[in-house]
């Protein structure tokens, strides 16, 4: 993911270690809840401001650009995720693109509730002002949040943990047994997640 070019110097740091329990991306279970940390979409707005594709007031402009350059990494939850997650993946290419990777090679599907997708107050304000739908922005990538799946029996624990460590964790959907089912439920209407694909790597 860091094989890009820049006219500035850059440094990559790799840390290796041991884990008591490895959370794999391909271990989701039928009926698992799907969670995501943090907010989605801010970074995409910031990128498009930098590309001069979006023009916005300065007070919001700096907020979104900072979210692109310095995303809110969900570091606090990493210490606990092995206690409740069956599968997990980070969001770099976009919510729905990375969900596809999470269930790759498993005969599973998912339904995401669009009304529960977490967005910031600033993004909510921007979308209302521009009369835009959140789905057009939250699946584009560069969020660097975590998607994970967990048994329904862990809901209470996850809710309490979210408050205790002050880390936003949102229940957004369910893993299903229909491998052709990649859907978004928006106000009772089922939409194909492929309509909201994120970043595609050309290699």
Residues covered by each model-derived region:
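Helix-biased detector of long, well-ordered alpha-helical tracts
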Residues: 1-203
């Amino acid at each position: 993911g860091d094989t890009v070019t820049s006219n500035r110097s850059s440094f990559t740091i790799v840390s290796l270690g041991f884990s008591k329990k490895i959370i794999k991306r391909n271990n989701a279970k039928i009926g698992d809840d799907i969670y995501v940390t943090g907010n989605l979409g801010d970074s995409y707005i910031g990128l498009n401001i930098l590309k001069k594709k979006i023009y916005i007031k300065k007070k919001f402009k700096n907020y979104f650009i900072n979210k692109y350059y310095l995303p809110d990494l969900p570091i606090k939850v990493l210490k606990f995720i092995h206690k409740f997650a069956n599968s997990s993946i980070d969001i770099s290419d976009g919510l729905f693109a990375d969900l596809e990777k999470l269930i790759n090679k498993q005969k599973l599907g998912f339904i995401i509730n669009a009304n529960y997708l977490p967005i910031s107050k600033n993004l909510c304000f921007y979308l209302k002002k521009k009369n835009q739908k959140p789905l057009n922005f939250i699946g584009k990538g560069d969020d660097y949040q975590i998607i994970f799946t967990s048994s329904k029996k862990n809901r209470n624990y996850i809710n309490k943990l979210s408050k205790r460590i002050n880390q936003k964790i949102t229940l957004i959907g369910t893993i299903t047994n229909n491998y052709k089912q990649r859907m978004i439920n928006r106000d009772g209407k089922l939409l194909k997640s492929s309509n909201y694909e994120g970043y595609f790597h050309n290699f």
